[in-house]
Amino acid sequence: MTSKSLNAWVIHKQWSGDTSARLKLFTRELGLINCLCKGGRTPKKQSLLQAFIPLWVSIEERYDQYYTRNIESTSSRLDLEGHSLFSGLYINELLYYTLSPDFPDSDLFDAYLFTLNGIALAREREAIEALLRRFEWALLKACGYTFSFLHEARTGELIVPDSHYQFVAGEGFILGGDKKIPGEHLLAIAADNLSESAYLKSAKFIMRQAIDHLLGGREIKARSLYGPA
């Protein structure tokens, strides 16, 4: 039996029996894990086992199953409402459906923290949209699914600002095609320049297709709440 202490966020919760809760936690140390919290229905634990509360969780592993030993909050719940709330639910669903269990990635964990704190503070929708696009790219990288914004996918030639390209999921950008994206936009996105609404719109279009390819047909319910992506 091994015991570990983790920085964690609740991604999903399901009641189990009369007293327990089955949790899916996103942690810095172990990545996404499934964990059984005995006594999870007590008022104290119910107040902690919510999304968007940073937690310090002590767990033990028995017979390939994680069990919580102690749960504490390290700060108050993030103040998310409206579009910020739906965006937070969106990125939680992305983690739930795309990450393999027990695969830690500190860069993705940091991106998650940065995004949550950013959307909690953001007052404009475009600022939230930019944060979501950057998180989606971090998630794609963590899942090993990346493509170049600087080179044409099939020839390897440099993207030309005045040319137009089509995004092909699983490949990248090819010259021409029906749904054309200006090369200027691709180069701006490559430079992390989402300051122009046109660049942000193209980034949203590209990431939507890339994320859908990664999801493999699984539905993200938060999209229907407010259309964050």
From Swiss-Prot:
Keyword Repressor part of the UniProt annotation: no
NCBIfam families, per database record: reco
Recorded hits in Pfam families, A to Z, give: RecO_C (PF02565), RecO_N (PF11967)
Instruction: Tell me which InterPro entries the record gives.
Output: DNA_rep/recomb_RecO_N, NA-bd_OB-fold, RecO, RecO_C
Q: Which HAMAP family does UniProt cross-reference here? A: RecO
| Assigned protein family | Belongs to the RecO family.
Listed A to Z, the keywords are: DNA damage, DNA recombination, DNA repair
Could you tell me what this protein does? Answer: Involved in DNA repair and RecF pathway recombination.
Task: Give the record's GO biological process terms.
Answer: DNA recombination; double-strand break repair
A single GO CC term for this protein reads: bacterial nucleoid
Per the record, the domain of life is Bacteria
Organism, scientific name: Legionella pneumophila (strain Paris)
Its name, as the record gives it, is: DNA repair protein RecO
Gene3D superfamilies noted in UniProt: Nucleic acid-binding proteins (2.40.50.140), Recombination protein O, C-terminal domain (1.20.1440.120)
Keyword Ribosomal protein, does the record have it?
A: no
